[in-house]
């Protein structure tokens, strides 16, 4: 009888040497994971500017994630918060993405980490945010 070897792809999240960042080895994205990600409520523009100027140790070139990127953090087996294990600073509410709603740049998609759902919010609303960059 031949033995079959099955590999199950797992999302590997590991903490890097730098404080306040997490590496998603599946997507090669470096995520900010700091108290501000849980505590701060800001407008879209404020979140965008914060990420633009963020530097954590050797990591810079941060930005707001696309909706697709942010949804890679959703774990539908978890609830309140519906996020992958490994993140310390999370609020079970909506987070900004850089994905504009249709052609209206006054509204952007958000991801809600209570259940993992998506919704559109006007840019003047205050929401949470999490910065990201591609691993180089």
Residue ranges of model-derived segments:
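Extracellular adhesion/carbohydrate-recognition regions
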Residues: 18-62, 110, 131-132
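Short, P/G- and charge-enriched loop/turn segments at secondary-structure junctions
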Residues: 115-120
